[in-house]
Structures are given as C-alpha cells and as structure tokens.
Amino acid sequence: MLVVAFAITLPAVTPRIYASDEIQYFSYLRSLWFDRDVSFENEYQYFFDQNIGRGEGFYATFLEHYTEAGRRPSFATIGSAILWAPVYLAGDLVARMAGYERDGFSYPYVAAVAYGSACYGFAAILLSIAAARRLVGDGMLAGILVWIGTPLLFYMYVSPPYSHACSAFAVALFVTVWLRVRESWTIGGAIALGLAGALMAMVREQDAILAVGPIVDFVGYLIKSHVTRDSSVSIYQSSRGPTPARGSLAPSRSAAAAGAADSPTGINHWQSGTATVHRLVLVGLAGCVAFALGFLPQLLAYKALNGHYGPSSMVTRKMTWTSPHALEVLASPAHGFFIWTPLAVLALVGLVVLARRGTPVVRPVALCALLMVAVQIYVSGSVESWTVAGAFGQRRFVALTVLLTIGLATLLKVLQGNALRPVVGIVIALCVWWNVALIAAFGTGLMNRQKLEPRQNAYVAFVTLPRMAPDIAYRYLFSRESFYRNRRAEP
C-alpha cells in the first residue's frame, strides 16, 4: 500500500533545476555521460545562458575561477551521479524515442534525475521502516511521519536534483547493512558495509563521518571478544518466548520471527560462537579495504578535477573544526534544525529512550546512533555556511532520516497504553503540519527564504495557509510554473 501511495504522489515531483547545488550535481552526471570527463565549463555555461545559473556569485565562482588542475570548480561529489545513472539512461532512451534533443540537458534528462531522486528518497523511507522494525518491532507509522514531517519531503518533490534524497537513501542503506552485519561480523558482511560506506561518502562527503557509529560498535565487539574470549550472548527475545508487554521495546513475536528468517539467530545481537580476535581483525581490514576500493571513483574524480586526491580547497577552508556553531545549528531561532524540524526533537528523545530502556543488545545500537547524530551536529556546526540560508531547512540533516525514524518508532512504541499518547499525537501532528506549511510558505514566497521568523511563520502556517490551501494545491498540481515564473534563481 505504501508503494501505491508513493506512486500516486509522483505527479507532485518537480522536474526542474534552478539552484547552484543542483547544477553542480547534475553537471557531474551530464559531463561524465556525454563528455567522459569532469570538466564542467560547458554545463555551467549552458545553465547560465539559460538564465538558470544566475544566482548571486554563480558566475564569479563557477565561470571565472579555475582549480589547480585547470578546470572549473565543483563542490559536488560523484555519488549522486552514480545513483542517477540508471534513470539517466532511461531519460536518454526517452529522448531518442520521443524526439527530444539528445544533449543531456533536455526535459527527459532533467525529469529522470528528479524522479530518480524521489524514488531514492522513498527507498530511504522503506529502509528506515525496516530498520525501525528490526530494532523495536514496528516502524511504518514512524516512517510515514518522518517522510512528511521533515525536509526530505521538500527534497523529494520540490527540489529533487539536490543530493539530499540520495543522501537519505545512502545512509539508510549503510545503517541497514550495519544492522544485518553486526549479527555475525563476517568478512563478507564487512565488505558489504565498507562498500555501502563508500557510496555514502561519495554522495555527500559530510556523511562519511557517520561511519563512526558502526566503527565504535565493531571496536566494542572486538574488545569484548578479546576480554571474554567468548562472544556468545543470548538473543534478547526468542520468537517462542512470551509476548512483549504493551509499550515494551522488545520487538513483537511476529517481528522476532521475521528477523529470525533474515538470519540464523534473529535480530540484532552479538553472534554466538568462538570468534577470535585474529578473525575480527581480518574482518575490520576487509571492511577498510572495501571502503577504499569503493571510494576510488571519487578519489580519481578529485584528482582530475582538483589536481589532488581531496576536495577543493574552497571547501576545506570553510571548515572551523572547533564547531563554533554547533548549538546554533540546532536551536537558532532563525536557522536551527529543531526550529525548522521540531519532529526531530521527538525522534531524538526516542533514541535516548532506546539507549536507556532498550534490550541489552539494542542499547549499543541506540548509543551508536546518538553518536552519529552528535558527529553530524559537530560537522554541520563547523561549516562556515552553517545557516544554509536560502535553502529549505537544515538540509544537511536529511541524511539522518533512518535514525530519526528509529527514534520516533521507539517513542511511539513506549507510549502505547500511556495516558500521554493522545497529547504526543497532537504534538506530532502539529510538527508534521509545520513542515508542510513551511514548504508551502517557502514555495509561495510567504516567508523569508534567508531565515526563519518563527512568530510570522506560525501565523502563516496556522492562519494564512489553511485559507489558501485549495488554491495552492491547485496551482501546484496544474500550474506549478506560477510559483517560480519570473523569480530570480537562488544559489
């Protein structure tokens, strides 16, 4: 049913490129596909000539400067291009059959990338639901709420050529593989995890730091094996055991049985056996080698584009590693993640609850998930452009979709039968509407795109937009160009 619901929403996807980030990520794919290089000058010039790349500073940044390798700079990475390649091929076939110009820029190519991003965003939701079900027994409602109640919705439907929907997918895939691999920590599993981590890092460089969660988890397992010389720990809940009490964080009997079908011993536990430290060291090395090999496309692209095996110096010099804006990136009234996306607060509360009240084998996962959130906050607070002014939401946190789903699923689980459940339900509904309303206000010009103004935003969300909702919905479905006609492109 969820797949059918997503299919029904596909007409809401906007096949359009307008921002500099979208241009950079799209140019990566177009240049590799048609020119077989990472020289983006012709792509940048095309968008500038089409009055698309006309945001403040676009020409000066991308059509005047050169890298050390003598190419026009790009702050994008290759991962989104890799993920978009299959749908871009479909777009090329459509262009050939339908008589569109086969130049890599025409409508079928842009539409392919846009719809591809939407599909990857939806895949992220499916993986997130599966991860939550694996840990707490249910995740469907939490996944739907995170889908609608976070900026992922915007980057799936309104501005899909950004990398954020792909980022949500890559991180969700990485976490899903981790949850499966940690049951046994085999060499094959470590290779899969390393490759998933490489994809995650190639989609967005910042997301590479999320590997710290599984790394800490693995090191903890390695230390435990070294100290005890016995990695056997009983499964937290046998599928033949008693049915969990309402609100318990142990997965239901059916969920446990489903997990048992996925692996020989069930969900998410330290594998029984006689694994040696020597074998685990080999497992760790296999994961590292797999990551290095998987990341090779990005390293080669760095070298060809920047003249060295690393990001542009224009990126690295924007970082202040003391993270002076860590608190602001969360709680600034004008730019904070929690103000843009209050549903995230409830989700993080859920992760804390899982870390404190989860079963012994689930608590380490929750603690590692909280560590992953913390390092994402740290990096986001280290970037000079931490405000991400002009974009919708604290978009760098879209990568945490899977972790937010797990946290929210936990909160919903523990509130079963609790007198506070209706109150929390109302709060969740308000959080979801807040996100939808901000998207509408952002698209219609009813808010300042450079910053939040909470009091004014609240008035628009709860007074103005309900009256305008029918007209906005009609325009979005049947006259979408009316939202951006004659609007100057933004960086």
Residue ranges: model-predicted function:
Residues 101-124, 143-173, 177, 198-207:
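Aromatic- and kink-enriched transmembrane "portal" helix at the membrane-lumen/periplasm boundary
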Residues 127, 166-184, 189-197, 213-220, ...:
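Specific aromatic-rich, kink-prone transmembrane helix
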Residues 29, 143-144, 189-204, 211-215, ...:
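Membrane-interface alpha helices of multi-pass inner-membrane proteins
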Residues 213, 218-224, 281-350, 368-380, ...:
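Membrane-lumen/periplasm interface segments of specific transmembrane helices
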